[in-house]
Amino acid sequence: MPGRSTSSSSSGSTGFISFSGVESALSSLKTFQSCISSGMDTASSVALDLVETQTEVSSEYSMDKAMVEFAMMDRELNHYLKAVQSTINHVKEERSEKIPDLKLLVEKKFLALQNKNSDADFQNNEKFVQFKQQLKELKKQYGLQSDREADITEGVDEDMIVTQSQTNFICPITQLEMKKPVKNKVCGHTYEEEAIVRMIESKHERKKKACCPKIGCSHVDMRMSDLIQDEALRRAIESHKKRRRQSN
């Protein structure tokens, strides 16, 4: 809660208003974002486990539903943080002697942001998008596509599909089957984590741009931040190895 300050030159205050308490509370709220992030990681991992073991659960315990709820919490928290920070910045710029109703100002800004909510917002949530992509890819590996997706692949040579899947297991740098695959968010290609990290670091040390090593790819300025763990592919590779051992 904001309080009165006897010195207008104190750090974190403007006029008679001190924002140190508000900013401290903001910092605490930001740590809650990591809890939401961890929850999304757990829900994603459980969802992939369910696909891998082909376990059916009721809609009440759907991981898709859990991920949507986490994404909604993340959006709401981001809106609240944005509303508070925007209000603080505005009051500091105004430098008014009169103490405004900060709670009312924050609520107005927060509601304005919430009123703009749409399902399209989830496309900006990296973990949610990654979850949907990996779930779709793993279902495809196990032949669990939706009817619509299955219709698209119906009639396609099964051996060709298997061969294509196995080709996707090969790192374009090492030319070996991947153990810890990472995906490039920009172009969608996958690589062995250690190999691509070493390649990017080597290029950047020489002040050069790192190009995607996949032949024909137009992504010519790779960053470490472009890489994300490809959990679905890792599981597919492990499953492929297991089947291969069982057939020998």
Swiss-Prot record:
UniProt keyword annotations, A-Z: Acetylation, Cell cycle, Cell division, Chromosome, DNA damage, DNA recombination, DNA repair, Isopeptide bond, Metal-binding, Mitosis, Nucleus, Phosphoprotein, Telomere, Transferase, Ubl conjugation, Ubl conjugation pathway, Zinc, Zinc-finger
Root EC class: transferase
GO BP term, pick one: cell division
Residues engaged in binding Zn(2+): C187, H189, C212, C217
Summary of subunit composition and partner proteins: Component of the SMC5-SMC6 complex which consists at least of SMC5, SMC6, NSMCE2, NSMCE1, NSMCE4A or EID3 and NSMCE3.
Originating organism: Bos taurus
Pathway in which this enzyme or protein is active: Protein modification; protein sumoylation
Subcellular location, record wording: Nucleus; Chromosome, Telomere; Nucleus, PML body
Residues modified to Phosphoserine: S118
Function: E3 SUMO-protein ligase component of the SMC5-SMC6 complex, a complex involved in DNA double-strand break repair by homologous recombination. Is not be required for the stability of the complex. The complex may promote sister chromatid homologous recombination by recruiting the SMC1-SMC3 cohesin complex to double-strand breaks. Acts as an E3 ligase mediating SUMO attachment to various proteins such as SMC6L1 and TSNAX, the shelterin complex subunits TERF1, TERF2, TINF2 and TERF2IP, RAD51AP1, and maybe the cohesin components RAD21 and STAG2.
PTM statement from Swiss-Prot or TrEMBL: Sumoylated, possibly via autosumoylation.
GO cellular component labels: chromosome, telomeric region; nucleus; PML body; Smc5-Smc6 complex
EC id: 2.3.2.-
GO MF term (any one): zinc ion binding
A Pfam short name: zf-Nse
Cross-link for Glycyl lysine isopeptide (Lys-Gly) (interchain with G-Cter in SUMO2), residue positions: K92, K109, K127, K132
Zinc finger (SP-RING-type): 156-242
Protein name: E3 SUMO-protein ligase NSE2
PROSITE patterns reported for this sequence: ZF_SP_RING (PS51044)
Transmembrane segment boundaries: none
Record's keyword annotation contains Membrane: no
Major location (coarse): nucleus
Modified residues (N-acetylmethionine): M1
Family as reported in the entry's similarity comment: Belongs to the NSE2 family.
